[in-house]
Amino acid sequence: MEELQGYFEKDRSRQQPFLYPLLFQEYIYALAHGRGLNGNSSIFYEPRKVFGYDSKSSLALVKRLITRIYQQNSFLSPVNDSNQNRFVGHHHNNLFYSSFYSQMISEGFAIIVEIPFSLQLVSHFKEKEIPKFHNLRSIHSIFPFLEDKFLHFNYVSDILIPHPIHMEILVQILQCWIQDVPLLHFLGFFLHEYHNWNSFLITKNKSSYSFSKENKRLFRLVYNSYVSECEFVFVFLRKHSSYLRFISFRTFLERRYFYGKMEHRQTEHLIVVYCDYFNGTLWFFKDPFMHYVRCQGKAILSSKGTHLLMKKWKYHFVNFWQYNFHFWYQSYRIHINQLSNCSFYFLGYLSSLLKKSSTVRNQMLENSFLIDTIITKFDTAVPVIFLIGALSKAPFCTVSGHPISKPIWTDLSDSYIIERFGRICRNLSHYHSGSSKKHGLYRIKYILRLSCARTLARKHKSTVRTFMQKLGSGLVEEFFIEGEQGLSLILPKAIPFIFQGSHRERIWYLDIIRINDLVNHS
């Protein structure tokens, strides 16, 4: 990365394209191959093999693919004509080769486009004298903030940020950050052809679904720039309202995914200007207290104001997306609810406000009277139904929650199969440690444990009961003991099993920098 930074600093002053030539540098694809293709951190990762490929990147083949992309209809030629071997020579499976090298270009593209963003971020830290480790804040840091602030709020808007219809919109947004015209031109062409290619793989050849699932790095980066554009109004308020008291935190969870997390924005008054959309008319929305939380494509907007105020904000977002990005957005995708009567799903938790009434008897001399006190508590629960639905998509169970075996893992060793299931279980326990009631995780653990036993029994052509008796407590320890050791660092005393005796303890960890895969699947 130091070599890339030096290249960037060297050519920054020149008025000519300097990012586009990086597409033809060998180390770009070596870096992409090392981080993008082999650096999969998913707990559902299944080894994917491209037949006949020796796991070494070939710059000549990548250059050949880039050249072919510029030719008319060449990107889809291996699909339309199985006898044509344009990309990689004569081979029996051109589909896997073409998707593989297209994925390589996508990963290399992401590394190149990240250069201006990452260097800008580093320079910002140096100017503000912010240590790097302060930037890597945990996802769990959002929930103590919600617990502290949402107790006094009235309404909450559950916003699902829409996906743009046209790929060209994403490229136009990047023009504000990148001035390299050839790179942007090639990016737009690549996104357009990739969209056609991806649609073909999903509809015509389901066996090649891995191509549509693995190319995420570039599209996450481009999508994040689009989401930042959606938050233009908030940035405008911070920069142009000198009298506005504004607290903002922006953290990038991980550089390789380039996700931006807006923890919260706190304002005393909010003024929204619609001068571009309504012929110079100014609309002022004032709110004594408002908070905005976003992670990826899901945002939460809460306020102490009235329901009318929240409806104004709702129509502001709808009009902003329609007029600025030129695509229709359904207003029903923004839900406005009263916090005291609803629960909202955010970051893998079902959050709500619980009101408990406590009665206290007060004795004064000969008179006694009762005092009723209502206590409001911010509650975070484990969404068991969502998790079971995610497990069924993996698949580890049926839609109704009945555990099933994992046939694709039967070629692995017994210890590796147990370790995989145990890792999934520990990740879930770690991620949902902040739940006030963890009893729901017992069912998830049961599904994973029995699915593991069914997988092992299928591998050895035995029954589940026989295999469970053979393993004894070894299988149980793999699912529970390691989680117990992690909790023992926080809880005052050791516990025999994870969550036993601590099912009401809420623990927020500071080392969670990515959303659990089951949360994304749900």
From Swiss-Prot:
Single GO molecular function: RNA binding
Keyword set, alphabetical order: Chloroplast, mRNA processing, Plastid, RNA-binding, tRNA processing
Cysteine-cysteine disulfides: none
GO cellular component: chloroplast
Entry's localization field: Plastid, Chloroplast
Main location: plastid
Keyword tRNA processing: yes
GO biological process, one term: mRNA processing
Keyword Ligase recorded: no
Role according to the record: Usually encoded in the trnK tRNA gene intron. Probably assists in splicing its own and other chloroplast group II introns.
Sequence similarity: Belongs to the intron maturase 2 family. MatK subfamily.
Name assigned to this protein: Maturase K
Protein source organism: Aristea glauca
